């Protein structure tokens, strides 16, 4: 019963957001990985991306101006690892924070040899356990065949579902 209610709520939120197939195509059409997804699989990825945005907010870091196209692109990339698992695998967190470029977290950082520095190194992405995913828009745009900061950080979120990260996120059989 709860799943039916959640599905109903997601559909209402997606409809209220008003994203269209054409907007989605314009936002992600130049991403090479998307060419792997055709027909029904592509439609499921699009619909899952819309539902992702119904459940998660995308917030600006350092007053960065965010567009709907940016949100659609991030959501689509985020949904690739869970296309066969389902959106519930991203439960327990609610926000993607988007900076224009790489960012420096405001916290101490310890190197492998034990030296503690006042601040962390520059990052392109970060995932917090039961917290937000933080991304650099410049790094999102650099996503290609060999790297993708969104998929990388979302894999960490999946990995963290099992009482902390162990380096083995759940993957569906086709991955």
Residue ranges and their predicted role:
Residues 38, 145-161:
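Active-site recognition of the HExxH zinc-binding catalytic motif
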Residues 53-56, 158-162:
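A generic secondary-structure signal for well-formed alpha-helical elements
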Residues 160-175:
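Post-HExxH zinc-binding segment in Zn-dependent metallohydrolases
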Residues 144-145, 175:
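Active-site metal-coordination segments of metallo-dependent hydrolases
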Residues 1-22:
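Charged, compositionally biased N-terminal leader segments and the immediate start
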Residues 16-53:
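Amphipathic alpha-helical packing elements
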Residues 54-144:
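Auxiliary, metal-adjacent structural segments of Zn-dependent hydrolase domains
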């Amino acid at each position: 019963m709860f799943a039916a209610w959640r599905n109903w709520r997601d559909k209402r939120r997606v409809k209220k957001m008003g994203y269209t197939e054409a907007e989605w195509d314009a936002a992600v059409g130049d991403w090479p990985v998307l060419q792997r997804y055709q027909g029904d699989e592509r439609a499921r990825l699009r619909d899952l991306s819309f539902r992702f945005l119904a459940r998660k907010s995308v917030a600006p870091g350092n007053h960065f101006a965010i567009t709907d196209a940016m949100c659609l692109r991030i959501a689509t990339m985020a949904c690739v690892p869970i296309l066969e698992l389902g959106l519930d695998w991203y439960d327990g967190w609610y926000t993607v924070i988007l900076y224009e470029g790489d960012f420096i977290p405001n916290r101490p950082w310890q190197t492998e040899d034990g030296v503690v520095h006042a601040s962390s190194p520059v990052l392109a992405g970060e995932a917090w356990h039961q917290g937000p995913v933080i991304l650099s828009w410049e790094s999102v745009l650099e996503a290609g065949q060999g790297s993708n900061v969104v998929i990388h950080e979302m894999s960490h979120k999946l990995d963290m579902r099992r009482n902390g990260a162990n380096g083995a996120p759940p993957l569906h059989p086709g991955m």
